[in-house]
Amino acid sequence: MVDFKADERLNTLNHSCAHVMAQAVKHLYPEAKFWVGPVVKEGFYYDIDLGENAVNDDVIAAIEKEMKKICKEGKKIYRREISKAEALELFKDDEYKLDLIDGLEDGNISVYDQGDFTDLCRGPHVDNTKLCKNFKLIKYSGVYWKGDANNHVMQRIYGVCFPTAEELEAHLQLLEEAKERDHRKIGKDMGLFMVDDLIGRGLPMFLPKGYTIWQEPVSYTHLTLPTILLV
């Protein structure tokens, strides 16, 4: 599986695509606010505060549609440096960005502009949004701001981006194959175990078939352990 963070080419491209996604979200939800949007091993993500709006499959489809529009428009991406005071003024309506800026040392801060969207970022980025056209948003989840359960929940949207459509399709095929091998899917499809949110998702409960399978190595251990101890 591709490591997007380690591959410099994919790292830059996916970092840029995260900004395209943020711009699309801002078009659809003008009141949206943004925390961080890094590249990780699996691609990229952005943590977003959508207020009372929740992310679902329809929202993801709408964001992807707007992203395709932005990519097709081929917006030039520019890097510029501003002072910390200018950054605080520029992002004065986004408390998440203000929190990030407050944590930076005094001096110039880099931002990236693409069309009507500006974001705080170290970079680097590609020079045009059209280079981000081969993307896919792959999953979403709720996360606590800064990973602190005492904070409110933000929406984290994950995606991947490749230089070519062929590379994207090949990667999506690998993800689909991995999903088919996932023990959670296999367990559900074969009726081996179930999970209950009231008990805890990390505490699966065996169903009859699963219990039978689990008993096999347990029984074998009971039969062979005395022999092993005598050796």
Place the predicted regions along the sequence by residue.
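N-terminal catalytic cores of NTP/NDP-binding nucleotidyl/phosphoryl-transfer enzymes
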Residues: 2-31, 35-38, 125-127, 203-215
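Mixed-charge, low-complexity segments
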Residues: 192-201
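Conserved small/polar residues in nucleotide/adenosyl-binding loops
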Residues: 221-227
